[in-house]
């Protein structure tokens, strides 16, 4: 699970640190940096797992505009299997040639070195923290991405597992056809556009979870029966409903945006809001009704433990009033400068947090 992240020289995040608990709701007006935090964690995850390189994960447009510093720095702290891992990364930019590369990359486990890379060379340490041979690495990629599980290096591989179990999603239930599944995929992408591919992967490896999801969806919609894949040329994800004793099926693209969003959200929570997982959702309550939002936040609260984690961004009054009093992290940004963590707004009139926000009780990103 995420403990904290430190960032410098990335968009509006300058000498910035944010700590996380089990449930976290990021709050603040548009432009204060909420989505920047979520998307940065997604970028770090993709980079560490070898899915992107420095040019894709940390493009020039991510440099802080009002500074002329050629280095970005990041520090990510995770807890996994009772060990605390710290990941440190520095990305160096050549402004003239419009290129960037890894300047330094370090992994610590309980304060001990597991991986230390600098200037294209890396040292890997075994589970007893003894130094191994020096290896050459690609300056444009994470050296950790090429580390595979070995008996002597289980801790470093556990770090990769911990990163892989950070699930980041900003679900968008429109603008693409995502009903066809041509291949299994283990990880959901940022917009959930590959939901059918991940569904295919999970239904074959963890059918018990799928049965649990069906039961949850039946409690929300008593006419829901099941979901299933069917079709020869690419399997189509179908939803089956009961209408007066007659079962009818609809492809994922045939149901409404709200129904698709509801399915994606409960799919995410049931499949990934589990032990040692961190689930990060950017504005998940778009497209769904007020009662459905209330059911969703209660469902998340009921499944929360000290072993799983959820980070949310939401402007929805129900979500704000449910989570903000105990789990809110308030962000502000003045004059389009640096993002900072602010104290919660105060009210002497007994207003809820959502009412305070709607009446301008927080500083805008001026």
Task: For every predicted segment, state its role.
Residues 38-100:
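Conserved P-loop NTP-binding catalytic core
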Residues 15-21, 272-274:
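Phosphate-binding P-loop
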Residues 11, 24, 42, 256, ...:
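Catalytic acidic motif of RecA-like/P-loop NTPases
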Residues 291-366:
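C-terminal lobe/lid and adjacent interdomain/linker elements of RecA-like ASCE P-loop ATPase modules
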Residues 86-219, 225-228:
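Electropositive, glycine-dotted interaction segments
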Residues 20-61, 262-268, 316:
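Phosphate-binding glycine-rich loops of NTP-binding sites
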Residues 1-14:
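N-terminal pre-Walker A segment at the start of P-loop NTPase domains
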Residues 31, 218, 222, 226-270, ...:
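Conserved ABC ATPase signature
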